[in-house]
């Protein structure tokens, strides 16, 4: 018998290190997956702690994504529990990581251009 979580319990798991979503009344712990999400972590972070069914279906995920999702399943949502609003998680930490990556990419690109110009 799967564990059953209230909407409140799921809503409490919307932080960067402890991150759950609901899809088709099933609860998934995507904490370890969000950084690997092909669409970027910002997309999935906007849905933390809440029902992501509509967004998930609208995107049209692959069979591989559906298989991966099965491995992240931790239980079902109690549909009789009261729905709650979820406070959005700040993605400033993620944005600063992204801008650091951009700096590295630009530095490598500049080195490549300098190397090309010096060896002409």
Curated annotation (Swiss-Prot):
Positions of the Cytochrome b5 heme-binding domain: 2-78
Any GO BP annotation: sterol biosynthetic process
Keyword Endoplasmic reticulum among record annotations: yes
GO CC entries: endoplasmic reticulum; endoplasmic reticulum membrane; intracellular membrane-bounded organelle
GO MF annotations, alphabetized: electron transfer activity; heme binding; metal ion binding
Membrane topology term: Single-pass membrane protein
Family per record: Belongs to the cytochrome b5 family.
Biological function: Membrane bound hemoprotein which function as an electron carrier for several membrane bound oxygenases. It plays a role in fatty-acid desaturation and is also involved in several steps of the sterol biosynthesis pathway, particularly in the 4-demethylation of the 4,4'-dimethyl zymosterol.
Protein name in UniProt: Cytochrome b5
Source organism per UniProt: Saccharomyces cerevisiae (strain ATCC 204508 / S288c) (Baker's yeast)
């Amino acid at each position: 018998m799967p564990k059953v979580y209230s909407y409140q319990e799921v809503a409490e798991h919307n932080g960067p290190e402890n991150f759950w979503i609901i899809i088709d009344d099933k609860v998934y712990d995507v904490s370890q997956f969000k950084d690997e999400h092909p669409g970027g972590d910002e997309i999935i972070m906007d849905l933390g702690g809440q029902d992501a069914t509509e967004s998930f279906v609208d995107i049209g995920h692959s069979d591989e994504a559906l298989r991966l999702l099965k491995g992240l399943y931790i239980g079902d949502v109690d549909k009789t529990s009261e729905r709650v609003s979820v406070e959005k998680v700040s993605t400033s930490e993620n944005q600063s990581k992204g801008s650091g990556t951009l700096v590295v990419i630009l530095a490598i690109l500049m080195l490549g251009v300098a190397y090309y110009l010096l060896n002409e």
